[in-house]
From Swiss-Prot:
It holds the Pfam family NanE. One of its GO terms (molecular function) is N-acylglucosamine-6-phosphate 2-epimerase activity. Belongs to the NanE family. It comes from Clostridioides difficile (strain 630). Keywords: Carbohydrate metabolism, Isomerase. The lineage of its organism: Bacteria, Bacillati, Bacillota, Clostridia, Peptostreptococcales. This is Putative N-acetylmannosamine-6-phosphate 2-epimerase. GO terms for cellular component: cytosol. One of its GO terms (biological process) is N-acetylneuraminate catabolic process.
Length: 223
């Protein structure tokens, strides 16, 4: 899968229960549209969505399950329970929160990564800073993604992608770096590839029409 997505675009097709497009059928069609536009991989949330997307597109899928737990702020594939659910989908890669925060039930990140790999599936570490990426590489993940930069209490929220972090990771890591998080424009995408990232995930800017519409409405209101 990593060879297939090198230098190409991955599109995130997700709609949570409180969002207008929440439906495996709709996400399957969204992924098909992304494929027709040139995407070579899909990041998707939830067992039903992943199965539908794989059936409709045949593209490799990075699978996640978002689930909230009372004893942790981690919600992207937080525990072994979500991993086991994802292993039933046939997704080629599982992404999980690899930040320094405490996992639900105090589960161990290193053991989760080992478990996924023992089941023959690639692992993407969603990180928020440099140290987390280094640790994830030591734990044996196949790639790191900058998904959570700006989304942890100890990282700075930026308007756009964390170019500084990406550049540093590309320079220092031996595994592929995937750009993800606030890649909002084709110009952003071009820049992250110029920094040397392996691939990039774009989500909201392509597949969340309520947010896209909101940007246009705000432009009117400003004037």
């Amino acid at each position: 899968m990593l060879d297939k997505v090198k230098g190409r675009l991955i599109v995130s097709c997700q709609a949570l229960e409180n969002e207008p497009l929440h439906s495996p059928f709709i996400m399957g069609r969204m992924a098909k549209a992304a494929m027709e536009g040139g995407a070579v991989g899909i990041r998707a949330q939830g067992v039903e969505d992943i199965i539908e997307i794989k059936k409709v597109t045949g593209l490799p899928v990075i699978g996640i399950i978002k689930r909230n737990y009372e004893d942790s702020d981690i919600y992207i594939t937080p525990t072994k329970k979500e991993v086991d659910e994802l292993l039933t989908t046939g997704c080629e890669m599982i992404a999980l929160d690899a930040t320094n925060r405490v996992r639900p039930n105090n589960e161990d990140l290193k053991e989760l990564i080992k478990y996924i790999k023992e089941n023959g599936v690639l692992v993407m570490a969603d990180i928020s800073n440099y140290d987390e990426a280094i640790k994830a590489q030591e734990y044996g993940v196949d790639c790191v993604s900058t998904t959570l930069s700006g989304y942890t209490p100890y990282t700075k929220t930026l308007e756009g992608p964390d170019f500084v972090l990406m550049e540093r990771l590309v320079k220092d890591l031996e595994i592929p770096v995937i750009a993800e998080g606030k890649v909002n424009t084709p110009q952003d995408l071009k820049k992250v590839f110029e920094l040397g990232v392996h691939s990039s995930v774009v989500g909201s800017a392509i597949t969340r029409p309520q947010l896209i519409t909101e940007k246009f409405v705000k432009a009117i209101e400003i004037n």
